[in-house]
Each structure stands twice: as structure tokens, then as C-alpha cells.
Swiss-Prot record:
Interacts (via repeats 4-5) with foxh1/fast1 (via Fork-head domain). Interacts with smad2 and smad3 (via MH1 domain) in a ligand (activin)-dependent manner. Interacts with pou5f1.1/oct-25 to form a repression complex on the promoters of the gsc and mix2 genes. Signal peptide: none annotated. It comes from the Eukaryota. GO terms for biological process: negative regulation of DNA-templated transcription; negative regulation of transcription by RNA polymerase II; positive regulation of DNA-templated transcription; positive regulation of transcription by RNA polymerase II; regulation of activin receptor signaling pathway; transcription by RNA polymerase II. Belongs to the TFII-I family. GTF2I-like repeats lie at residues 117-211, 332-426, 597-691, 727-821, 824-918. Residues 461-480, 916-961 are annotated as: Disordered. This is General transcription factor II-I repeat domain-containing protein 1. The gene is gtf2ird1. PANTHER family: GENERAL TRANSCRIPTION FACTOR II-I REPEAT DOMAIN-CONTAINING PROTEIN 1 (PTHR46304:SF1). InterPro entries: GTF2I (IPR004212), GTF2I-like_rpt_sf (IPR036647), TF_II-I (IPR016659). Transcription factor that activates a subset of organizer-specific genes. Binds to the distal element (DE) of the gsc promoter to regulate its expression. In the presence of pou5f1.1/oct-25, forms a repression complex on the promoter of the gsc and mix2 genes to inhibit their transcription. A motif (Nuclear localization signal) lies at residues 929-936.
Length: 993
């Protein structure tokens, strides 16, 4: 929650609530409570540093006692201090009020409240805003799309040349530097009524803006200001398209413009808070369609008129950020409004990133891509110890530090993310502006052509953001664009472009065949039947580097189906702003079997190609004749023995479902050099044997069409695919957490000079800040337990594993393990032994069930029914339970006695009495997995933290190898791992419990 500005007067009185903006959610009391709570948190943090704080906060009649424990005891035991402080503040304020009343009586000002003067930077800000408003309005009167400075000297010498309409009563037009604070505030409040009109037409003036708001402003007394009439006419929006769209940053026209005198007087008291509120508030987009309602009543909400005063706020913030002088430094240092600061930092980042790309307009920064590929963009001049993130994640202190270094911050692009940013396609939110547009033609045809040119990446004089394709596009006038669809283009004749216009008439609803002009290959003419000559032709010039990408826009009332002149095997896409035609007049042009609906189909096709590529390469590595499904879990579990060579730089081996379009295409480009390496064939020997003998467990074969992998899951219901997918995601996340845990332990052991990995004492490091320095982590990722990270951050950590380094600056208790404690030094060995014991138990349990393959043990069911399964041959004093709870010595003893261990199923565990005897019959059922509940380790206390974080990972790490290599029947999964909510089937035969 951000405070709207700095108070100019530190006194407390009954009029102070007016200085707080009423639009802040929750009101002033909630803000004060929140700030006092934050102050109390700071005192608590200071107490941890052996610092005592005592603080008294006074607001009107309420007093808050904040501080450390000793500080609060001190203040509570001395109530006279609070009373003295309260009398001091109230007495001083009353004295100031009396002096103010006397001064007002002397000056003869009885009913007008005094406006406190703020710092010099604040009056500069108001004058700058007024100057920006005058320049924008003057440029609009000239018909210019760019900003033209107002010739104040010429206007003063020739009063009749320029007429200013809508200025507040008693204020004449002059230079903004000559206005006082009160006049500036009134001008800003009535900025939506102000209009410039050229009395003497110049060569530059083309047309005069017409707006209904000209007719509803109070009359003025100045000679250069013409009073406006009180009548209001309803005008359609199309008659003045530039009045609302040519303003910088698309400021909406207000629909409530009448003001009451009382509201005008009270709003003059807002000072810097009003300035900050004007910079922060944005008019809602819903007001855009209400332009015709000029005579609406003023909203009773206080401060609602201030929401209309954002005409040039973003333009002004851009000037503040890029001003080389120190004129705005004091304003940036003094303001406490986090929204203004974040907006400034956002403008700074976007402009610097655009400058690095060589563009002359701001471009949104791809924060997520930069976070995933920090080596692609180098950021110079950034403040120390501040990571580069989205501005919305910074607080006020960091935002101010960034703005202090704004002139030194520069971006350097080392590798590009997406070339489409230069193509002017739908993925750029800010497009280039041009000053060469003309406003003299018909508004309707001009708007339609401008929309078409904007979609093709052409800059136009009108607001390019109105025509840029985005997710927020809504149907509107012809100058706006509707929803966008991607259509696959196919044409038998490359010289013919086929265009279908459904719904225009019975004669033109079919397909129009147009011959492409061969004289200029860069010009394509599209003729829409049934329209006028002014709107039927669109001749866009293709500036995109990709000649296969064509963007076409037509009026909103027409639906278009466009076919491009490309070969069928090279699919490309065109933007279709029309609706899907259910009548199917253009369905003849489409091949329904090859139709691609959008990006989702593209990425699915790419993932299928990469999946087939991996299966072929894996089959080649193991000597199989056909494609074999890759056991991804095995490769993630044993990265030193199973790995892949030849992948593109920065791309780790994972399932194709984890990649995006960019990485999938890069993998396909490097397909010839990709090679699977298997150092330990015994890890995949079971799957290899199945492939060699061609058993039902065979994972795939070569299809003639596109080598699609067919396995047992293709004959199963769809729930099994979802089942395996969910298990694979859980297994991937748990495996990544375990790998990061091992990485941290290894790096921590190296920092201590110990041969083996050492368990990282996360809590002790947190309680002793500065004792251990961790370097090399990706930007924006703090150091904490791996079990608290998601898969994306875990992958980013593993990608920079070589750069991560631990440095111990000062020792503390528990930093170095005891020399006689071998378990702490053999933590990595414990993880391996635990997995071996799990595999041993699963194998023994599978034999006890009469199966020829391992089965996952339902430890929870066995614990609840200890008489159901008997385990023989266990070492002395070692009970049978989940291996996660064993310490290192017990794991070693179990492995030594593995030949003597046997399991005997005395009675079947519910609900599997009859099902287990006939596993092949049960193949159907809508079941889904649930993650196992974590249980606290009962083993060694030193490695308890590791066991807790990896209990679920180790328990589920066996699932994917079993399901992928053998496809264990669902009857072998324990009951608590299944969800029977969607099960709707009949079991074969009666069940005897």
C-alpha cells in the first residue's frame, strides 16, 4: 500500500483528512494502521540487532506506542511523556491556525482556504503538466500527430490568432511559468474542457477538433477566451476520431464534466498528493463509449475529477526519466508514491531495452526470458545488490536507487529471443509512430486503411496502440481490431490468392479468385466485393523479414478467409479478424485434417517431432530396430551414467512437454548431432530386454507416415495418460529438488574443505546473516531449501551449477560437523543406499504377489495392517518400514542381508483380494494419483532436514521407471495413491474381503 505523497504541513488538525486522497482503498485509517504495523516490524528487526527503539505516533486524538519490548515498557510506564507530546503537537498546530486566520482577515480572504506551497520541484511538476496539456491541444488544433510547442510570444502579440476555450473562470491564457499554484490546479482540473481553436487558418491547420465537451464549460472573462454555451449535442464518436485518440498514451475522454463550486474549492487543497494522484490514476476504459453523454452529473465521490487529469502524465514521466539535468532529482527523492516510481522504472527499462535493440519506440522487456537466460542480456550500471526484476516487485528504496542511476543503466543484447519484435507483428505492444499521416481524407476510409496498415506493422498518425493486436482487443468501430485467429494457408496455385467474404450478399459470399500482380512482388492488392471504392482496396507493403507472414485487416463488419500463395508443406499463417463462418462457404478452401487452430497446435506438433527424434536416437543408442520410448526419469536420476550429447547450448535434456517453441525448434535444428550415451546398461536393461524380445512391453515401432510411437498406453483409456503425466510431473519436480539438494551439499562441503557433501544448515545460516555467502545463484532466486522452489527455479539453479559457490566468512555454532560424525560426511552415499533399499523392497514385494516384476509397496497399508505382510530375514533390531526413515548404518545392514530378506503376504490388503490374482483383467478405470503425505523422518537427526525435503521425491521416484518400462497394472498401486471419485466400472466377478 502506497501513501499518495508527502505532507507539506506536519501539523494535525481536522482538515488534514482532506489531504489524503479519497480514492485509496480502505481509507486513511487503514493506511495509518498499516504504516504503524510496518513501523512495529522495523522495530522488531532492530531489536534482533541489539537496538532499542521507543516511538510515539500521534494522529488527531489517537496515540500509538511502537518500539521494542523495552521501549514500549518505558513509554507505558511514563504516561506523562505521551501527554506532553500530544499537548506540544496540538498546541503548536492551534497557534499556527490562529496566525493563519489573522493573516486571512488582514488580506480580506474569508472563504478561500490557503493552499500551502510545496517544494520547488512540485510547482515545476504542475507547470510542466500544464505545458504538456497546452502543447498537446495546440498540436491537435494544427492537425499534427506529433507534439508542437506553443508559440506563446506570437499568441500574446496576436490575441486573435489562437482562441482558448474552456479555461476556468478568471484565468486567462499565458505561459505556464506565470501561473501560481492555485491557477495551475484549476487548469488541471478543467483540462478536459480546454480546447484550442485557430482563428486565422494557417497552412498547417487541416481541421478543427469538434467535441461536445467544448459546449459545457463555464464562461470566462478573458478577451482571448470565448465562453461556451450550456447546450450539449449528442455527436457520434466517428465524427471526431482524433479528439480522443490522438492524445498521448490514449487518455479516455471523461463522461462527467460538470463541477460544483464547493468541490472546486476543496480540491484546491490537495498539493503534492493531488499531483501524485493525477500521475497514478488512470481513467477506466469503460468511459470510452460514453462520449456522447456530455450532460452527465458529477460523481459525488470526492476526488473523481482528479482522475481526468492524466492527460500528459505518462508523457511527463517519460520526460522526467530521460531528462539529463538534475531538475527532477529532488522530486524523485522526495516522492513516496510507489506507483509513480514503478511507472518511471518501467519506462526506463522499456526505453533502455528498445535502445539496445536499435528501435526508436519503447518495447516491453521480456523479464521471464531474461530470467531464464541471464546471459542473453547484459545490464550495465545497475545499482549494487539489487537484482533485475519487474518493477512491481521493488519497494520504494530500491526504486529510488534505480532512478538515481537511471542515466548509467544500459542494456546490451548478446543473443536475441524473438525476431518477431522487428516484424511489427502482434507480439509488440508498442509500435513506431510517424509524423507523416494526413487527416484530410474521409474519416471512415482513413480509419479502415489505418487499421489495415497497423496490422501490417505500418506506423500511422493515429494511436498505434488502438490498432495493435492484443488480448484486450474488443469489438468497436472500424478503426479498432477484433479478435485474432490464426489460419493455415493452403493454395494449389502459388500465383492465386483466394479470398472468401461470407455474409455480404448471395453473389459475393463465395470465393473470389484474384490474380496477384507480378510487377511489384512486395505489393498485394485485396479487393473486397460489395464495398465502396474508397474502402475496398488495401495495398500494404510487406516490411517483415519473413515474407511468409502476411497480416491483413478489413472493416469489422466483414469476415475474411484468406489463402496465401505458399506450398502446403510449408505452413504459414495469416491474421483473420473475422468470425468463424458456420455456413462453411470458405470451408472448401481448408483441409480440416490439417487445420491448425493456433499456437497450441504448433507447439504440439513440435513436441511430437522432438519426441520422435529422442525415441529414434535412444533406440539407436541401445541397438533397437525401431523407436523406443525414452525413460526420462532414469536419465534425470542418473545424470552421470545416462546423458545426451549434442543438445543446443543452454538446453538441458528433459521431456519435450517441458520445452517451449523456441527450444523445440533449436533442438530440431541440432537433430543430426544429438546422441544418447548409456554408460550403465543395467539401469535400462529391463526395458532393453522387452524391446529385444518384442514383448507386449515393447515401447514403440516405426510408422510409415511420421514414425508415431505406439505403446500399450494407446489402447488404454485417457485416464491412464493423465495418470502417467501427473506422475511424471511430480517425479520431475522431486528429482530436481533432490539434485539441487545434492548440489548445495556438495558446494557447502567444498567451502568447508571436506571431501564428502555436507548437509547445509539452512536455519543456522539464516540466523547468522553474512556468515556464509552464496554466489552465482540466478537473478531473483534467494538461497533457501530446495523443497520450497518450483520446477522452473530448480532448473534455473541447475543451469548455473558451475557458477554457484559457497564462501564461509565467519564460523558459528554448528557450521562444521563433528569429525567423528561420519553420517554428515556421507550424505550423498545415503541417498544412493536408500534408493537401493527401496528397489530391493519393491522387488521382494513383487515376488510375494506372484509377479515377475517389482511392485510399489503400500507402506501405509502395511503399517495399519501389520499382520497382512510378514517380512523375514531382516537384520536384528531393524523393523520393516519406509526406507526414508532409516539411517545410514541400517541401510548398509539391510543391503548386506538382502539375500535372506523375504516377504510373505498372509492376507490380501483391501481392496485387492481378488484383483491381485488376476492383474491382466483390470485395465480400465478413471483413476488419478494423489501425492503422498510427507512423514517426518525417524532416522538420524543430522540428516532429518534432507529426509523431510526428499521424502516425497524418493517415494515417487520409483513410479516413472516402473510405469514407463513395464506399465505396472493399477492394482499394484496402493489405495491411498488412487482417486476413486471418477471410477465408474464393474469389477469382474464377486469380491471376497
Amino acid at each position: 500500500m502506497a501513501l499518495a505523497g508527502k505532507q507539506y504541513e506536519g501539523s494535525l488538525n481536522n482538515s488534514r483528512p482532506n489531504l489524503w486522497p479519497s480514492s485509496i482503498p480502505g481509507g486513511k485509517n487503514e493506511i495509518i494502521t498499516s504504516l504503524v504495523t510496518a513501523l512495529d516490524s522495523m522495530c522488531t528487526a532492530l531489536s534482533k540487532l541489539n537496538t532499542e527503539v521507543a516511538c510515539i505516533a500521534l494522529h488527531e486524538e489517537s496515540a500509538f506506542v511502537v518500539g521494542t519490548e523495552k521501549g514500549r515498557c518505558f513509554l507505558n510506564s511514563r504516561k506523562e511523556l505521551q501527554a506532553d507530546f500530544q499537548r506540544f503537537c496540538i498546541g503548536a498546530h492551534k497557534k499556527d491556525q490562529e496566525n493563519e486566520v489573522k493573516r486571512r482577515n488582514r488580506d480580506g480572504i474569508q472563504n478561500i482556504q490557503h493552499v500551502p506551497l510545496g517544494p520547488t520541484s512540485d510547482i515545476y511538476l504542475l507547470r510542466k503538466m500544464v505545458e504538456e496539456i497546452f502543447e498537446v491541444l495546440y498540436s491537435e488544433a494544427l492537425g499534427k500527430s506529433n507534439i508542437v510547442p506553443v508559440p506563446y510570444v506570437k499568441v500574446m502579440k496576436e490575441p486573435g490568432s489562437v482562441v482558448v476555450l474552456g479555461l476556468p473562470d478568471g484565468i486567462s491564457f499565458r505561459k505556464p511559468a506565470e501561473y501560481d499554484l492555485k491557477s495551475l490546479m484549476l487548469i488541471l482540473k478543467h483540462s478536459h474542457n480546454i480546447r484550442f481553436k485557430l482563428r486565422i487558418p494557417t497552412e498547417e491547420s487541416i481541421r478543427e477538433p469538434k467535441s461536445c465537451s467544448e459546449l459545457n464549460s463555464p464562461p470566462t472573462s478573458a478577451t482571448k477566451v470565448i465562453p461556451e454555451t450550456s447546450q450539449c449535442h449528442r455527436l457520434p464518436i466517428q465524427e471526431h476520431p482524433s479528439s480522443a485518440s490522438n492524445f498521448p498514451y490514449s487518455v479516455s475522454q471523461p463522461n462527467q464534466i460538470s463541477l460544483e463550486p464547493k468541490q472546486e474549492v476543496h480540491s484546491n487543497m490537495l498539493g503534492t498528493n493531488a499531483v501524485n494522484q493525477m500521475l497514478v490514476q488512470r481513467p477506466s476504459a469503460e468511459n470510452n463509449h460514453d462520449l456522447s453523454d456530455c450532460c452527465g452529473q458529477q460523481s459525488p465521490v470526492a476526488g473523481s475529477s482528479l482522475r481526468q487529469n492524466v492527460l500528459a502524465s505518462k508523457h511527463l514521466l517519460f520526460s522526467i526519466v530521460h531528462d539529463k539535468t538534475d531538475k527532477w532529482d529532488s522530486f524523485l527523492r522526495e516522492t513516496e508514491d510507489i506507483n509513480i516510481l514503478r511507472e518511471c522504472v518501467q519506462i526506463l527499462f522499456n526505453s533502455r531495452y528498445a535502445g539496445a535493440l536499435g528501435l526508436d519506440h519503447m518495447v516491453p522487456v521480456p523479464y521471464r526470458k531474461i530470467a531464464c537466460h541471464p546471459e542473453a542480456v547484459e545490464i550495465n550500471g545497475f545499482p549494487d545488490k539489487i537484482p533485475f526484476k519487474r518493477p512491481c516487485t521493488y519497494g520504494v528504496p530500491k526504486l529510488k536507487r534505480i532512478l538515481e542511476e537511471r542515466h548509467n543503466i544500459h542494456f546490451t543484447i548478446k543473443s536475441m529471443f524473438d525476431q518477431r519484435i522487428f516484424d511489427g507483428t502482434t507480439f509488440t505492444k508498442e509500435t513506431t509512430k510517424s509524423d507523416s499521416s494526413s487527416l484530410g481524407e474521409e474519416a471512415c476510409s482513413e480509419n479502415q486503411k489505418a487499421a489495415a496498415l497497423d496490422m501490417l506493422g505500418f506506423p500511422t498518425g493515429s494511436r498505434s496502440e488502438k490498432s495493435s493486436i492484443s488480448d484486450e482487443c474488443e469489438p468497436g468501430t472500424s478503426s479498432e481490431t477484433t479478435g485474432v485467429k490464426l489460419i493455415k494457408l493452403e493454395a494449389e496455385d502459388p500465383d492465386i490468392m483466394q479470398i472468401a467474404v461470407p455474409g455480404t450478399s448471395s453473389e459475393t459470399s463465395g470465393v473470389k479468385i484474384i490474380k496477384l500482380e507480378s510487377e511489384d512482388p512486395d505489393l498485394i492488392q485485396i479487393t473486397v466485393p460489395g464495398t465502396s471504392n474508397e474502402t475496398s482496396g488495401v495495398k500494404p507493403k510487406l516490411e517483415s523479414e519473413d515474407p511468409d507472414l502476411i497480416q491483413i485487416a478489413v472493416p469489422d463488419r466483414l469476415a475474411e478467409c484468406v489463402k496465401n500463395h505458399l506450398a502446403p508443406e510449408d505452413p504459414s499463417y495469416v491474421l483473420d479478424t473475422g468470425k468463424v463462418c458456420d455456413d462453411r462457404p470458405c470451408g472448401v478452401l481448408r483441409n480440416e485434417n490439417k487445420h491448425l487452430d493456433g499456437i497450441g497446435d504448433i507447439i504440439r506438433q513440435l513436441r511430437k517431432h522432438v519426441e520422435n527424434l529422442f525415441n529414434r536416437k535412444y533406440a539407436k543408442a541401445i541397438g533397437a530396430s525401431g523407436p523406443v520410448k525414452v525413460p526420462y526419469a532414469k536419465f534425470l536420476m542418473y545424470p552421470e551414467d545416462l546423458f545426451v550429447l549434442g543438445l543446443p547450448e543452454g538446453v538441458a535434456f528433459r521431456r519435450p512437454n517441458c520445452f517451449g517453441i523456441t527450444k523445440l525448434r533449436r533442438i530440431l535444428e541440432y537433430s543430426d548431432g544429438i546422441q544418447f550415451v548409456v554408460k550403465r546398461p543395467e539401469l535400462i536393461s529391463e526395458g532393453l530386454e522387452d524391446c529385444v524380445v518384442g514383448s507386449p512391453g515393447t515401447l514403440g515401432f516405426n510408422d510409415k507416415s511420421n514414425e508415431v510411437i505406439l505403446d500399450e498406453t494407446n489402447t488404454r483409456p485417457s485416464f491412464q495418460e493423465s495418470f502417467d503425466a501427473r506422475l511424471s510431473r511430480i517425479d520431475i519436480a522431486n528429482t530436481l529438488r533432490e539434485q539441487v539438494q545434492v548440489l548445495f551439499n556438495k558446494k557447502y562441503g567444498e567451502a568447508l574443505g571436506i571431501k564428502y557433501p555436507v548437509q547445509v544448515p539452512y536455519k543456522r545460516i539464516k540466523n547468522n546473516p553474512g556468515s556464509v555467502i552464496i554466489e552465482g545463484l540466478p537473478p531473483g532466486i534467494p538461497f533457501r531449501k530446495p523443497c520450497t522452489f518450483g520446477s522452473q527455479n530448480l532448473e534455473r539453479i541447475l543451469a548455473v551449477a558451475d557458477k554457484i559457490r559457497f564462501t564461509v566468512t565467519r564460523p558459528f555454532q554448528g557450521l562444521i560437523p563433528r569429525p567423528d560424525d561420519e553420517d554428515a560426511n556421507r550424505l550423498g552415499e545415503k541417498v544412493i543406499l536408500r534408493e537401493q533399499v527401496k528397489e530391493l523392497f519393491n522387488e521382494k514385494y513383487g515376488k510375494a504377489l506372484g509377479l515377475d516384476q517389482p511392485a510399489l509397496i503400500p507402506y501405509k497399508l502395511i503399517r495399519d495392517n501389520p499382520d497382512a505382510v510378514e517380512v523375514r530375514g531382516m537384520p536384528n533390531d531393524i523393523p520393516f518400514r519406509n526406507p526414508n526413515s532409516y539411517d545410514l548404518h541400517r541401510l548398509e545392514n539391510i543391503l548386506k542381508a538382502q539375500d535372506q530378506i523375504q516377504m510373505v503376504v498372509i492376507k490380501q490388503l483391501e481392496p485387492f483380494p481378488e484383483i491381485c490374482s488376476e492383474p491382466p483383467k483390470i485395465k480400465n478405470g478413471n483413476t488419478g494419483p494423489k501425492r503422498k503425505r510427507k512423514r517426518v523422518s525417524e532416522g538420524n537427526s543430522i540428516s532429518s532436514a534432507s529426509s523431510n525435503c526428499s521424502s516425497s521425491s524418493s517415494s515417487s521416484s520409483n513410479m516413472d521407471p516402473i510405469s514407463s518400462a513395464h506399465h505396472v497394472s493399477l492394482v499394484q498401486w496402493p489405495m491411498y495413491m488412487l482417486d476413486y471419485g471418477g471410477l465408474n466400472m464393474q469389477l469382474p466377478g464377486p469380491i471376497n474381503y
